[in-house]
C-alpha cells in the first residue's frame, strides 16, 4: 500500500515538473517566434531584400520557426500526455524531420552564397540569378525530404494492421519500431553532417585566403563574410548535435528519472532553441540595411498608434467645440 502511494506521489511530482518546465519553454519559444515573425514581415515588406542572400535568410527564419513550433508541440504533448492518431503522428514527425534537415542544408547554401560573393564577385550576379535561386531552393527541399520520406514509407509499411487505428503520445520514437531503421537514420544523418561540415570548412578556408589577399577597402567586407561563415558553422554544429541527444537521454534514464528530465530539457534548449537564436543575430543585428528596416517596422506600430491617438483627440476636441458653439 505504501509503495503504491509513494509511486503515485512520485508520478505526480514528475508530471508537475514536466509541466512547469514546458511552461518555461513556452515563454522562450513565444519570444523567438515573435522576433522571427517580425523579421519575415520585414523581408516581405521590402523589395530590396529580394536577392539570394536575403531569400535564403528568410527561408532559414521560416524553417527555424516552423521547426521550433513543431518541436514545442511535441514537448507539450509529451508533458501533458496528449494522444493523437498514429498516422497523424507519422506525418507530424516526418514534417519535423524534413525541417530539421532543411535548416542546416540552407545554412550550407548561405555559406556557399557568401563564398561566391567574396571569391567570385564577377560571377555572383549570374550565379545568384532569380532562376538559379529558385532551383537552389528546390534542391534544398528535395535533398532534405529524401531521408524523412523513406523513413515514413518504411514505418507505414511495417506498422501492424491492428495498430493503424491506435492513438499514441507523439514522439520520434513512435516511428522507429524497426531497429535497423533507427540505425540507418543515424548513419545517414551523420554522413550528411560530415559532408555539410566539410563544405562549410572548405568555404571558410577559401574566404580566409581571399581575405589575406584582398585590398585594404575590401578587407572589411571580406572579414565580415568570414565571421558570418563562422557563425553559420557554429549553428550547424549546435543544430546537428541533436543527433547525439537520444543516446544521452537513454544513458540518463538508466541513472535517474529526474536527471533524465533535466538533461532532456537542457538538450532541448541548447540544441533546438539556441541555434535558432543565431539566425536573427547573424543577419538581423549585424546587417545594417536589414537592421534599420527591422527597427523601423518594430517601432512603426507604436508611432502609428500615437499618431492615431493625437488625431482622435483633436477630432474629439473639435467636435466638442462645435457642439458648444
From Swiss-Prot:
GO terms for cellular component: cytoplasm; intracellular membrane-bounded organelle; membrane; plasma membrane. Gene3D superfamilies: Rhodopsin 7-helix transmembrane proteins. Residues 1-22, 76-91, 157-190, 249-267 are extracellular. Disulfide bonds join 89-170. GO terms for molecular function: G protein-coupled receptor activity; odorant binding; olfactory receptor activity; protein homodimerization activity. It comes from Danio rerio. This is Odorant receptor 131-2. It is a multi-pass membrane protein. Belongs to the G-protein coupled receptor 1 family. GO terms for biological process: detection of chemical stimulus involved in sensory perception of smell. It holds the Pfam family 7tm_1. Residues 44-54, 113-135, 212-227, 286-325 are cytoplasmic.
